[in-house]
Amino acid sequence: MKKLTIISLALGLLMNTEAAVAQESVIQSTALKLPVGTFANMKRTTFDPTKHGFKFSNEFQTQIQIAGLNGPRFGGLCGGMVYSALDYYKTNEPIPAQTHRPASGTTLHQYILTRQNNSTLLNSNGGSNADKWAELILNPFGWRTNEFFNWGLQGSNGGRVQELVEMMRSGSPVPLGLFKDGNGGVGPHHQVLAIGYDLGRYKGDLGDYKEDFKIFIYDPNYPNQTMTLRVNPAAQNYYYQERPDNKWLTYFVDKKYTVARPPAISSTPLANDGLVRQLLIEIGTGGDDLRGGNDNVNVIVKYTDGSTDIYPTVNKRVRWMDNYKESVLLSLRRAAPLGQIKCVMLQTTFGGGIGGDNWNVDLLRIVAKSSDQERVVFAQTGSPLVRFDGNNRPFEAVLR
């Protein structure tokens, strides 16, 4: 697992959302500065959130561990999802079709995590957005609040409107950083993808018709939707037309993005025979985590004829942190009618007690997938539903 730097994770804490790099090419902004009133009034790229965006929401959580102890925890990998979606788009690769958030340790999760690191600090071209965030955070007594807000409306002298227009001339979407004021500058901030803009009657001159200005957004917090970033000059904020409670003081144009080759994640259509071919298993860890390493969990699928299939180490030897849900998609080795699948069992591999591991499972939900339907076949919760304490007795979920 490629580890994030402590500095990058610290930036991740500031951007807590209400959620191997190769073949690189740098997006270059046009060197020629555009005089006020000469840029294109509107621009839409071909990026469509329903086609090019992820189908799952940005509900990730990540926790720093220091000397084996659980440290700070932050939510959301918005920058990683934005960079990754743009990678798939620019390399003409199909974005993964899965609707569930990828579990910790999976190929897609690791890639998004790496791209989160790139988006905040350590980009592969040596660039960094740390200076952008730091400048906005350092605003004692709000002395620069008006200035920061106006940057988002300036169409000249390096203003954000000018940067956005110049970078979108080529038809490429552009990542944005959204800065939320207050709370001592610690956010929650956000990262999104600008996929178009419309100036309306606004000229980029800080004059009339500021309210006309719109930026069309792919936001990983809102899959399959196009959000519209609008301006409220009286309140000095930028907000979503569709969700006015989402608002920020200002934004910046991310000119440090470099494209990378994303992983190919297969999604073969299920055979049209009505048989259950996949099980989506959602496991909510309670107040005691699954350690990973040598302490893991296996899934056993048992059929009515007495046969079983074992899927070992479904957590991929990665820690599943407390009070967090992970999802595992099993492609069954033996497709079968639902009535022939008797139960699904969770079996741990560790010893309990001092020096061992204990694991609380508060939620277990199982969805059976065939070509024509998805059906919830087990759903139970508890506090905990089951505690694995080293006796290695499996928990049996009888399907309905």
Residue ranges and their predicted role:
Residues 168-177, 212-216, 342-345:
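Short, hydrophobic/aromatic-rich segments at coil-to-beta transitions
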Residues 1-4:
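Positively charged n-region of N-terminal signal peptides that target proteins for export
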Residues 273-400:
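Regulatory, non-catalytic segments
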Residues 152-207:
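Active-site-adjacent substructure of cysteine-protease-like catalytic cores
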Residues 8-16:
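Bacterial N-terminal signal peptides
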Residues 18-22:
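Sec/Tat signal peptide C-region and signal peptidase I cleavage site
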Residues 45-157:
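Cysteine-nucleophile protease catalytic domains, especially the papain-like/related folds used
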Residues 185-189, 198-277:
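Cys-His-centered catalytic/binding microenvironment captured across papain-like cysteine peptidases
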